[in-house]
């Protein structure tokens, strides 16, 4: 059973509130990276984040997911303002409510694939260990890597490592999965397979927030945010577009915005 959102409530109409809300979200390092963003992400939505290099894509994902703290503003998960949580509370929330898929899986080299996958489940302590292990095996079967359960990290391909990374992200049945360029280090054929698997994750009801530079990847999303200079320059709903037409539209928008930002 999916872990419930902290302090989540239903609206008066009976519909669920947004999965994530950002209000006046800002982030600065030596200079501003995110500039006073407001954003609602609905439950079950697949949101892709695009934009030129340095536009704030990964920073936005990190602030939304609690991996980095904003310089100003707030992020709410249900009714819980995660930006006000302590580091310990935030770490527990990330472990139990969020899943993460990165460009590189970053698995522990001393553990086999199955042990890497179930470790976050053991740490969360939400279920008995035998149940967590059984879930890990089911996820590996679902991702097509069940035969590699006992294999070491150096004994499998990059695509198999990324599949294991997806399994690890799902071990605690998170409500939201954050993905940062999950296909960026893969060849075209393997990248398509990984996208199909992430599409299945989204189809099961999981909210998916993905950073990508590739219009063909973003074209699979329900909604695409295009960032320029830390601001949302475009917020596109793609539901009415076929995937090929969506990719063409996104490519045109992205190219125009990149020219504008130069």
Residue ranges and their predicted role:
Residues 50-52:
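The feature captures the beta-strand-to-loop junction immediately N-terminal to the Walker
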Residues 65:
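Helix-to-loop junction immediately C-terminal to a conserved catalytic motif
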Residues 73-81:
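Conserved ABC transporter NBD signature motif
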Residues 95, 151-154, 172, 204:
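Conserved signature/switch motifs of ABC ATPase nucleotide-binding domains
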Residues 111-120:
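Short coil-to-helix segment of the ABC ATPase nucleotide-binding domain corresponding to the Q-loop/switch region
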Residues 152-156, 160-162:
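Conserved ABC ATPase signature
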Residues 177-180:
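Catalytic Walker B motif of ABC-type/P-loop ATPase nucleotide-binding domains
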